A protein has these predicted regions:
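Consensus positions within tandem repeat domains that build extended binding/scaffold surfaces
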Residues: 74-77, 97-102, 120-123
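Structural signature of tandem-repeat unit edges
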Residues: 1-47, 52, 57-72, 81-95, ...
């Protein structure tokens, strides 16, 4: 299991356009907390294996659409994404956790559907 976690971390590091200390810290914590068989990476973000929780976004794009099926935007999932300007939250999302979009200074346009029932403190 340890080798599997290390291999996944290496893949995520290579996919990251900026290999910053914060991203490495978040990825290491995610790998320690979550069994490696419990999440997947689609090239832009890390999700739980059932794709109901967005754990961490690695995209450096100005716009991001959270895919349908995601129910929870995880704590610090988008934290520090300086280039992020537009976010479209899928209708399936029910909860936005603490600090999910913290330090996204350029975030200008957010679509939050009516189905979002919980927005925890400091989410934005």
């Amino acid at each position: 299991m340890k080798e599997n976690k290390k291999a996944i971390l290496e893949i995520l590091k290579k996919k990251s356009k900026k290999d910053g200390k914060f991203e490495n810290l978040v990825l290491n914590l995610a790998l320690q907390k979550i069994d490696s068989d419990s999440f997947e990476f689609d090239g832009d973000a890390v999700y739980t294996n059932d794709k109901k929780r967005l754990v961490y976004c690695m995209s450096q794009e100005a716009s991001f659409a959270i895919p349908e099926g995601v129910e929870i935007i995880g704590e610090m999932a988008f934290r520090g994404k300086k280039a992020l300007k537009n976010i479209i939250i899928a209708n399936s999302v029910k909860e936005i956790e603490h600090d999910a979009f913290y330090d996204c200074d350029e975030l200008d346009n957010v679509y939050v559907p009516a189905g979002v029932k919980v927005v925890k403190s400091y989410a934005f």
